[in-house]
Amino acid sequence: THPKDKTDWELYVPDLKEYLDALIFDGFSIVIFSNQSSFGDPKKKEIILSRIEQFVTLMELPIYVFISTESDYCRKPNTGMWEEFFGEKTIDLKESFYVGDAAGRTRNPLTKKKDFSCSDRMFAANLGIKFETPEKYFLEETFPQKEIFSMPKVWETFPTEQPPFDPEDYEVIILIGPPGSGKSSFVESLSDFIVVSRDILRYKAKCIKLMNDVLKTGGKVIVDNTNPSREARKDYLEVAKTYGKKVLAVQINVTKEQSMFLVNYRCKKNKTKRIPDVAIHTYFKKYEKPIKGEGLDKIVERSFVPEGDLTLFQQYF
């Protein structure tokens, strides 16, 4: 049941203080890492903070609390909270462990419902520390392995190589691909093209104006937007036609699951906010496969290929 007010809570086990006291005696630090996106609501924020304060006061123990309030690199299962909290301190990961109820179970033994998430178990996996559910750690209950959601290693679904790209003699390139698919990184390899992007210019009208200005002076243009539909691509194709330019479409083939993964990866790598899921869902809902009949002269398909140090890339997001 949902709590009624800030005082409507109870300890998971009556002797919780003894558990925590013993851990502190053995040299452990007690840290609460919590995702709380509801902090945007002042009333909910007050209630949650009040409960935490009541709990810490009741325990009479040194307990640290780190709360992620945004959908960014600190939100579990990202490890940003841990990194921000501990900084450069050396932590014994072999002895450390994390207890959480977002374990990916298809049936929680207490609530009889599936867990709302798998973020706690993924958080521990990303840190390389042991994970326990509250039921197992405090009550010594276990649950069948078959009741655990699988944690797909999305990073294993990406190709490891692809052929080099040759723009040939094309002066207009239109990119097609969902958020996070590597379009902007691809653009960086084509320094002789002027980038036309709504991420930079915000409005399509400004993009069209810039494209006109570049082409009429003999420059080259690469349109760096998601461009999922024929309608989204139409205006750019018309401008290219006005100047008699051939158009090369570069479609970056990334699945929705991979796009979700890549958006989270970029968020963690750059320590930024995460692109909302709705942007990804919208792309795939509007997507129309590019065809020459809409005015494209050639269509090339590419993939996202991870490069460099893959340590961060090979994490759960």
Language model features with spans:
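Pre-Walker A (Motif I) flank of P-loop NTPase domains
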Residues: 168-173, 218-219
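Conserved GTP-binding G-domain of TRAFAC-class P-loop NTPases and closely related GTPase folds
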Residues: 72-139, 143-154, 257-317
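Short, acidic loop-to-helix structural element flanking the phosphoryl-transfer center
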Residues: 2-31, 39-53, 75-80
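Conserved substrate/cofactor phosphate-moiety recognition/catalytic segment
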Residues: 185-234
